[in-house]
Amino acid sequence: MSDVLFPDLPGLEWDLSKKPIFNTKIMESVNGRELRASYQAVPKYEISLSFGFLRESKGKNELQQLESFFLERRGAFHSFLFKMPDDCDYTCSYSGDGSTTSFQLYKQMHTSVIPLAHTKAETVFEVDPTFWNENDNQQFWSDNDDDLFWDDTTAQVTKSGMVTLSKPLKQGHKFEVKGTYYYRCRFADDEQQYTNFMSKLWKANKVEMIGSLGNKV
């Protein structure tokens, strides 16, 4: 398992597909009633993509990048990180409780919330919490003379899907974090086909992966 990124190549076509998969054991009795057991809380994904062109001329070595990446992973053996187009950005909102400094980043999909295990690390940045407290009864000022009028809290996003604050936010104060997440993937098979359709031009009609937003696949 490594954190190397799948190559970002311009020949990637729009017909990328993903299929969420769960693991459910279903036992059926003679009268037709079923007993079901779920062995997987977070789905894995079957991901399929294709490259309409892979150039091998004028300083471009796109075929070599893709093929060598596959070889270095030993086919389906080693995993890697994949930034899926149009499915890689998160926006997370949190409320302070006066004590918590670490928060789990997540992907919001309509009513579903999926924890993220692989995110782009961000160095220290300033948190900009909402100015008004969600508690209407909270007084505007502080009785503590050492409290600043502005908030000087900073935050850092780790590569493991956590955001850490330099100090706890006050009860009810909210803040928002935006960034990039990755899928943990492996190749679906131990083989991959490339087609030479013109001089110095290749294509890969199908590159298939098994992926997850969790830490392992």
Language model feature labels by segment:
Residues 150-173:
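A surface-exposed beta-strand-loop module
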Residues 64-153, 179-217:
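Extended beta-strand solenoid/passenger and fiber regions
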Residues 1-70, 183-202:
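Solvent-exposed edge beta-strands and adjacent loop segments
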Residues 36-37, 92-93, 165-167:
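Beta-strand-rich interaction surfaces with strong enrichment in secreted/lumenal proteins
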Residues 51, 173-181:
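Short, hydrophobic/aromatic-enriched beta-strand segments in well-ordered soluble domains
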Residues 44-46, 100-102, 160-162:
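A generic structural signal for beta-strand entry/edge sites
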Residues 52-53, 106-110, 165-171, 212-213:
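Secondary-structure transition/turn motif
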Residues 40-42, 98, 158, 168-170, ...:
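Surface-exposed coil/turn segments at beta-strand junctions on protein surfaces, enriched
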